[in-house]
Amino acid sequence: MAESRWHTFEWDDENRKNGNVQHLRDHDIEPEEAEECFFHDYALARDDRRFDDVYIIDGRTDRGRKLRLVFQGKSNGVARVFTGWELKPQKKRRS
C-alpha cells in the first residue's frame, strides 16, 4: 500500500447541487472510490494550468477501477477533490 500525503478529505454536503460529491457522482464516481485512490499506488502530477496546490492523480479503487482525479492539496494532509473520471483502456490503432 502506498503512503499518501493526503489522508483526510473535504466533501460538500451530498445534497448540495453544485458540490464536489454531486459532481463526482455525475461522473459515476462515489467519494469513497476517490478516497481509495490515495491509498494504492498512484501517479501524481501538478496541474500547472491551475494554482500551485492543484494536482492530478491516476489511481485505482479497491475494486480495481482506474480513476483520474483533480484535487487541491491543502494543509495538514487534506485533499479536496474537484472532479474525476474513469480511465478506460485505449484501443490500439491499426496501421
Language-model regions: role of each:
Residues 1-95:
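Ribonuclease/tRNase effector modules and their secretory precursors
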